[in-house]
Amino acid sequence: MDRKVGTISRGIRCPIIREGDDLVKITVDSVLEAAASEGYAMRDRDVVAVTESVVARAQGNYASVDDIASDVRAKLGGETVGVIFPILSRNRFAICLRGIARGCKKIVLMLSYPSDEVGNELVSLDQLDAAKINPYSDVLTLERYRELFGENRHPFTMVDYVQYYSDLIREEGCDVEVILANDCRVILNYTKNVLTCDIHSRARSKRLLKEAGAQRVCGLDDIMTAPINGSGYNEQYGLLGSNKSTEDKVKLFPRECTDLVMAIQAQLLERTGKHVEVMVYGDGAFKDPVGKIWELADPVVSPAHTPGLVGTPNELKLKYLADNDFADLKGEELKTAIEGAIRAKGDLAGSMASQGTTPRRLTDLIGSLCDLTSGSGDKGTPIIHIQGYFDNYTN
């Protein structure tokens, strides 16, 4: 019988991961035990993926509010600091902000509008239109924002982030002034010491600030890049990709992940004889069409992966072939013709026959699949096993 199933993505249950656990052994054992219990076999070019959260937990990669405060104070002077373009998230930024506030005397908090970088709205575009506000040029004080738009709560969490962040800063004994603007250089009218908290546009923000005369400029990726009093750290991403662990501690994005994925690949090869690709994944980079949230608060989808996951898909669009090249064929004759075209394909970059085949990196595509499979709550499946991803219609 012809094969009837293509790509399969399985969430693999494993023990709760604690600091110091052997994640290589746990991952390999869990994947092989799942395969044995469900009656399927490992194959060459399967993909095993591990969520960044359990990697960081096993590493013990944590930082406290006091650690963050100490680093902010050392790098930005401890006086008045402009904190610009943070995302609106209790999980992703609130504990970091508590540490930042503890390391300053005053924060000028500059929020982007109508939404943050990943789509959390402070106001709607319709509200801006009605108020005749130009988000590209207009700078709003807190008073003007409240006068025009009142209280705006997040549609899902019902949090008024302007009030929430202001209260959090004051709780740390730090003064706060709130403005809304979208040009990072506006902050230099208030202070020359700036912590730019954007994620994917951070390099440009830093460049513009330095060119405009800022004295001290850091991004979140410059805070917690080395241990503070024995804390965790991430030399490449700092606080980027961190999230709440407790009320006074964050879990940092994992480090040294390449050694992990290569070790998992080697153990799977030793125990199964199969060459399996391995990656660590975080946010899946998909966008919610209703809430308008871009699921990429991490600096990258995958901080590490085996070499076989480098590149982009090289695929033909079956419906294009069926509707154009082989429009006069049907049934077995059409199937044979399409299989022949697939077997004969070369590099399809720029080819009309490949249009609509999602030109994204493999790690980003597979990371989306993994994040959607594992979820972010109580499924208990931080390991994903994907089979058939690299197969096509001929396999």
Give, region by region, the residue ranges found by the protein language model.
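Conserved mixed alpha/beta catalytic, RNA-binding, or beta-rich assembly cores of soluble enzyme
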Residues: M1-D44, S53-N395
